[in-house]
Amino acid sequence: MGYFIDRRLNGKNKSMVNRQRFLRRYKSQIKQSISDAINKRSVTDIESGESVSIPIDDINEPMFHQGRGGLRHRVHPGNDHFITNDRIERPQGGGGGSGSGQGNAGQDGEGEDEFVFQISKDEYLDLLFEDLALPNLKKNQYKQLTEFKTHRAGYTSNGVPANISVVRSLQNSLARRTAMTASKRRELRELEETLKALENSEPAQLLEEERIRKAIAELKQKIARVPFIDTFDLRYKNYERRPEPSSQAVMFCLMDVSGSMDQATKDMAKRFYILLYLFLSRTYKNVDVVYIRHHTQAKEVDEQEFFYSQETGGTIVSSALKLMDEVVQERYDPAQWNIYAAQASDGDNWADDSPLCHELLAKKILPVVRYYSYIEITRRAHQTLWREYEDLQAKYENFAMQHIREPEDIYPVFRELFHRQTVDN
């Protein structure tokens, strides 16, 4: 009775190597699909991964074929409409509806739908936050924030052909063949010695010599059947993500919850901050996050209250900046911490308060932070706060501004604010 031994180590994911190769090959199309999909779902809904669709034309293999232009001579069966040397005009639009994707309908022809497949939670987050990093991150005196980088980590028994280690695979092949044939080779040597002794003995023992020769031939066949290389022998260079100490960092999240922020605007602000939280927790092992809500008064709150509290009031943006400055002085020494801030507001502020915000940022906050981002969420025209901040953007490289009008603007704005930059040591 024969047995099949499954030596594959991928468990249920027996096509993982092919899947990873596919994700690398069509990364740009997949990232575009994810960018489109994030606007149609909650950013917190990541447990189920994401269904990704790729136009079928993008994954078809290239092929040579005749172009649609020019004149071609064909021989067709005759009928009562056409005679020899008649010219037949091509149908407008290039044919009768064959093709894929969106376009005009045709009465005949065939096409294919977009290719749709499911990616996991980890694959979704890796692609979502690829090429993003905290800007201007520098190494300070105390290193607690941990980044992950890819390093060589020995060998593994599964991987892609590009990472195969020929030397290690041949070493394993030699060891396996030696172990599997050692007893047979030892028996073969004994039989050969016995046969040699019988050939030199008197009188000749022909029947015994013939039996030993058959046994020797069978042993040689068994040894020859042991494959030179087996999938069990293959070894691939292994790579793993290792935590590397970097500078410690803190992110201040300042959210306007005043009465001018309607529910739709607040929801967009929360979605931006949830995206920021997922990015920080996914990319960095240790990072402090300080949540500040403000209307006429600012208050440091926990994560639950920041996202779900219903408290509201008037608008004095400077109250949040003053509180941030106090927290920095009390807990986060700029010489030891990389300080970041993300402020979201609808831009509506008490008229006399906007110049004070400009002064607080210019004199106290921007000199000590690595990066300060302001996100204005409104469909209306910009007001005094935006104009005050525009002056800061022109003077300070570590100050950035973006405008969100619709929910579909959130992810592109987020990527623009936190795209990976050169890191100073």
Curated annotation (Swiss-Prot):
This is UPF0229 protein YE2273. Residues 84-110 are annotated as: Disordered. Pfam families: DUF444. Residues 92-108 have a biased composition (Gly residues). Belongs to the UPF0229 family. InterPro entries: UPF0229. It comes from Yersinia enterocolitica serotype O:8 / biotype 1B (strain NCTC 13174 / 8081).
